[in-house]
Each structure stands twice: as structure tokens, then as C-alpha cells.
Amino acid sequence: MIVTLPARSGIELSVTTPPSKSYTHRALIAAALAQGRSTIVRPLMADDTKLTIASLMKLGVAIHADQHNIMLEGCDGSFPNTPGTVLDLDNSGTSLRLLASAALLATYPVTLTGSARMQERPLGPLAHTLNDLGGMVIFTKKEGYPPVTIGGRLLGGTATIDGSQSSQFASSVMMAAPYSKGPVDLTVTGTPASQSYLDITAGVMTDFGAVIRREGYRRFLVSNCNHYTGRTFVVEGDYSSASYFFALAAICGGKVTVAGLAPDSVQGDRLFLDALQRMGCEVTYAHDGVTVENQGPLTGITINMSSAPDTVQTLCMVAAVARTPTIITGIGHLKFKESDRIAVTADRLRMLGGIVTAERDRIVIQPATLHGGRIDPVNDHRTAMSFAVLGLGIGGITITGAECVNKSFPGFWEILSKVME
């Protein structure tokens, strides 16, 4: 699928954000492990979450899903899978990482694999921790990377995990921990990447009945005496998906309102709104949504986005049209996403005339006169959506492989077509 974006200005748009991918993944796994029946209301039905659903069904969980609800019969902490279970998670890092620890709760060993890019995404820190807690983790191709076969049992105890590459490693252990043989005392070393996602994990676990004591983002103690209980769980709206429409208002000028956002959400990508406000946009919060309005030039800022990784590329697009430089730090872990997002973003902006300096943990974007061009997002949904928004600001940008947005936001192009008309 190829999409060419025309230049637009004076945007007036009201949309409802899709449900959160992060919450949907975690609610699915908690419900699958719970005792009793759960209904997940307003889940995100996208490629990644469908992979999690399919994998849980392969592990023996009874699931019925439609576009509005997902019903699960929990397995009470023991997946009744069959010998030789293989879970192909394609390029869904969240699915593979969260399910890796849960695989220790399966009757038979589980092999997790994925796309060529997935096999380049590190899993070593999680494997070391699972081995310390009673698992038997075997990498079948390259040490530290999928494919991986996971057996053994989650015995519990004290362990450490390196959180500098991804907070999903710690989230994975935490989500399985209520069903360990003993309590789990997990210490996160390094500077935790995307630490706000640990708040999401802990929140979902608590909602399903787990008991967690924590010391900030450094230590999590999970009881094995309080298991998950089936319940009805309503998935909140996604701030990262909403960011593309907020960026439209900033880049094209105009006013965009996004409904379906919890004002008290712990999602780290809320930081994107603070960034827009600092750059010159007017941001208004209401009970069930947020409005962003911009009628003038944007000013560059310096900001640490370590807690809001999924909106870094969107912010880069806004920075590219600002009248002063922008410095974004705390982004080193983006190298391990669906693509090396730091390198890809810098390269594609330069193709459009941007002046960009990319380093290990930061990116600097200077004011420049931009022009159109052809953008290959290398099958990365967030790259495609970010450059689409920039395309509506400057015109003449063509996105190839545009269907990759289905990974997290199947309705993206349909909504954007309202602006393109």
C-alpha cells in the first residue's frame, strides 16, 4: 500500500483515540492466567494484540473475541498446552517478552520465535533472570536473541534484571510472578527504559487481584499468595496513538480534539502534550479528552523522552518544522524497537532536507526548509504514522508499505483521509 500526503493547513478535527495496546496486552495475559472468566471491554484489535490472543489460544486458553469485547476462561495459573508448542510472534516485541515469563507456567516447554527483525531484538537480560528464578531458557539460533525455548518452573526468589534496554523484561517477570512457587523479589538495575510502562503493568496486575510492594522503579516484591481473579476490564484510550493527531494541529495549524483519554492516566506518552505546550501549542484538558490548538510558529525545546518512547518520532516531526533547534534525549533504547528508530528517523528526515544529528542517546533537529520525498518506513508502524503527519504539513511525502500501521492502529489511514480530502 502506497499513500501520498497532500499539504493541508488550518486543521479542524475531532476523533476518538484507539484503545491502548499496552493495556490490552497486559489485560489479556492476566485474564488468561486468572481463575474464572474475564471480559476485556474495548480492547485494541490490531496485529500485535491478535498475535497475543492467538498465542494464548495455542497455550490452551479458551478465548472468544469480537471488535468490542474479548471473553477469556482463565487457566488458574497453568497453561494446558501440548508438547512442541511454538508461538510465532512476528515482530511484536511486547507479545514475545511478556509471554516469555508466562511460558514457565505452561505444562510443556514453549518455543517463542518471530520475524527476522524480532530475531535481532535482545532477550538476554530476561533469559538470565528467568534462569535464576527456576527456568531453563535455551536460545536455539543466536545466544541472547529469539528463537528461544523456555521450560522449567517459576520457583520464585530474589533476582535482578537489567532494565536499560527495555522495561518489558521486568514487566514480563512481574506478570507471571503471582504464580511462582515462592514470592518474587525483583531488583531492576541500570536506568530503567520507559519506566512508565512498569506503572501500567503494576496497575493491571493489581486490578486483577495481585499484591505488589515496590520501591519506586528499582524493586518490586510480588506475592505468590494472591492470584489473578477473573473480572471485567475496560481498556483506556491510547496516548501514543492520539499523539499523531495532536501533532497535526501543531504542524499544520488548527485545532484537534481527541476523545477517549483518561485525564489521570499513568501512560508516559502524556509527556508529548507537555512538549507541545512548551513549543507553543495551547493544550486544554477535559473530562474525556484533550484539545490541542496552534495558530503560530513553533519553538524548539530540550526534553528527556525516556518515559515516552512511542511519541519520540512524532515529536521529531514537530521539531522538524520548528523555528529553533530541538534536542531530544533519553532515547537510546529506541534502537531495539521494530526498527532502529533513531537511525531511521534521522535518515528519513535528511532525505526530506532536514538537518539532523543522531547520537546514541539523543537526536538534535535544526530548523530547515523541508521538501517532499518517498519514505520507506521499514515495516515500522510508528515511522509510517509519524512521517504521514509531517507529510500533511509540507506536502509531497509518499509512504510505501503503509499497511504496516495495522500493527497498532488499523484505522489510521481512514481517519487521516478526513484531513486529506
Swiss-Prot record:
The keyword Transferase applies. Its EC number is 2.5.1.19. It is an enzyme of class 2 (transferase). SUPFAM superfamilies: EPT/RTPC-like. Pathway: Metabolic intermediate biosynthesis; chorismate biosynthesis. The active site is at residue 310. PANTHER family: AROM/DEHYDROQUINATE SYNTHASE, PENTAFUNCTIONAL AROM POLYPEPTIDE. This is 3-phosphoshikimate 1-carboxyvinyltransferase. It comes from Methanoregula boonei (strain DSM 21154 / JCM 14090 / 6A8).
